[in-house]
Amino acid sequence: MAAAALVNTPQIPMVTEEFVKPSQGHVTFEDIAVYFSQEEWGLLDEAQRCLYHDVMLENFLLMASVGCLHGIEAEEAPSEQTISAQGVSQARTPKLGPSIPNAHSCEMCILVMKDILYLTEHQGTLPWQKPYTSVASGKWFSFGSNLQQHQNQDSGEKHIRKEESSALLLNSCKIPLSDNLFPCKDVEKDFPTILGLLQHQTTHSREEYAHRSRETFQQRRYKCEQVFNEKVHVTEHQRVHTGEKAYKRREYGKSLNSKYSFVEHQRTHNTEKPYVCNVCGKSFLHKQTLVGHQQRIHTRERSYVCIECGKSLSSKYSLVEHQRTHNGEKPYVCNVCGKSFRHKQTFVGHQQRIHTGERPYVCIECGKSFIHSYDRIRHQRVHTGERAYQCSECGKSFIYKQSLLDHQRIHTGERPYECKECGKAFIHKKRLLEHQRIHTGEKPYACIICGKSFIRSSDYMRHQRIHTGERAYECGDCGKAFISKQTLIKHHKIHTRERPYECSECGKGFYLEVKLLQHQRIHTREKLCECNECGKVFSHQKRLLEHQKVHTGEKPCECSECGKCFRHRTSLVQHQKVHSGERPYNCTACEKAFIYKNKLVEHQRIHTGEKPYECGKCGKAFNKRYSLVRHQKVHITEEP
């Protein structure tokens, strides 16, 4: 099929001087031209016809550039008027150009090219026209070469002389002369005939031929025998050999050698992970990573077993890396800071980003930048509110998978991180590291304003709010603001009256678990702090220190407004509300407000009728403690 033949066009031999050696005979353009029948031409689409036109024109120009030598070596090249659709003129022109000496195109070659150009320019719109007529038989032909072949068969000759064939073809040529000019696409010049344009274009052929020769050299130089369906794929593939990187990332200038690699790389700067594993649902940035995951995780045999924990791995390299978690080996050491790593990938990432300060992954919501792309992806869940990891026990959801794993230890009771000094165990490794600083005395977080140091970074951040006055955590019920979130949570229980931690000995309830533990020491007499002055015991050292101020008379907390002094800071804070007029405790029954919480509790007993203070002598009950004390004085005066 002709159409298929043109799509898979074989390489047309390059015409060089080897074709025109006298010992091998003369080669003309007609010898290497390709022809189609009327039916075959009708099967070609516009793109295929254009390709045919370009190939034939290139071969013609190449033949003209090296010289056809078809019996006219000593003659000068014909001009525009020499050969045309109208006939032969006697006008002559000099050689085609100074850059191509002795370059000629014989009349036969020009006529063949005119046939091809006529057909391709009309694009088969007039397929019934057959401008070549045989004088002997009266038959019509689409191409002059077909007419010549027919006449050879009629005469029994295999070859005819050039003079006879040229005259015959010229006399039988019925190509209508177009009124339009033929422009050169290389320079702004028009020609009245196709032949004039062809002769002019041979002046460009030497430079074009040299350029194509360089391209051919590069193709041979980097030849790797890979085959591609489209030219664009060949161009991108050649960049592998040349090292060219045509696609550049705007964010930080990374260059890549193909558009596909560029698109794949861009996914590292966003959250797109289009390749999803159909077995486990895990998604990946690149198709190659997905294929590797499926081969390694789901299909590949896990024949390497860790003798420490029994975990199976798919490769010996993975087993060696895994065993470092047991033996503590960290072979990759940073020569800048001395930090060591178990995995080479982590080590390389540390060197590339930590010491250079590079943070290429920027959150478009808040502008925060990150060293790794996965850190940015996890951070963006803060803005989207996505909590993909849910606890199957209590339904609580988390942003990070590690947070879920840590939370689940609350249900299982697992505390894998144990202190070697005191044996105390922790759920989180971070808590163990913070605890170990108690034994070492290390306090790495120092306030630059007052110099106070802290074991935990959270304590340091909370302390800084004292200097800045920031109270970021506000109560939604009463509008009171607090420095820390933990203090706000404690405060909320005032409104809800929630006391979830109850003592099993006396039934007393507490807001916090730590308060319950401190209280239980009273019953167990464990680690009680006893006052040397009066023998009173306390469950916590802090309470003992506050109590001892009663004996010493120390009142270190002074009011800046009135100069009144107090033993405890909490008492000073409560007192300062007298000056500010703040009354944060409101009665829900009568909307009366109070400065102190205990005053609100006492007031509410008026509405409830509760009288918890009962006299042991007469059984009379009171709603306030001082009312009971005042009543008991009556019984004292009655005694003899």
UniProtKB/Swiss-Prot annotation:
A Pfam family of the record is: zf-C2H2
The domain of life for this entry's organism is Eukaryota
Q: Where is this cross-link: Glycyl lysine isopeptide (Lys-Gly) (interchain with G-Cter in SUMO2)?
A: 223
Mind listing the GO molecular function terms for this protein? DNA-binding transcription factor activity; RNA polymerase II cis-regulatory region sequence-specific DNA binding; zinc ion binding
Query: What's an example Gene Ontology biological process for this entry?
Result: regulation of transcription by RNA polymerase II
- Choose one Gene Ontology CC annotation of this protein and give it: nucleus
Zn finger limits (C2H2-type) = 217-241, 247-269, 275-298, 304-326, 332-355, 361-383, 389-411, 417-439, 445-467, 473-495, 501-523, 529-551, 557-579, 585-607, 613-635
- PROSITE patterns to which the protein is assigned, alphabetical: KRAB, ZINC_FINGER_C2H2_1, ZINC_FINGER_C2H2_2
Q: Where is the KRAB domain?
A: 27-140
Q: Which InterPro entries match?
A: Ikaros_C2H2-ZF, KRAB, KRAB_dom_sf, Znf_C2H2_sf, Znf_C2H2_type
Where in the cell? Nucleus
Q: Keyword annotations for this protein?
A: DNA-binding, Isopeptide bond, Metal-binding, Nucleus, Repeat, Transcription, Transcription regulation, Ubl conjugation, Zinc, Zinc-finger
Family designation: Belongs to the krueppel C2H2-type zinc-finger protein family.
According to its UniProt entry, the function of this protein is described as: May be involved in transcriptional regulation.
- What PANTHER family has UniProt attached to this entry? ZINC FINGER PROTEIN (PTHR24404), ZINC FINGER PROTEIN (C2H2 TYPE) 276 (PTHR24404:SF39)
Q: What is this protein called?
A: Zinc finger protein 549
Write down the species: Pongo abelii
Which gene carries the instructions for this protein?
ZNF549
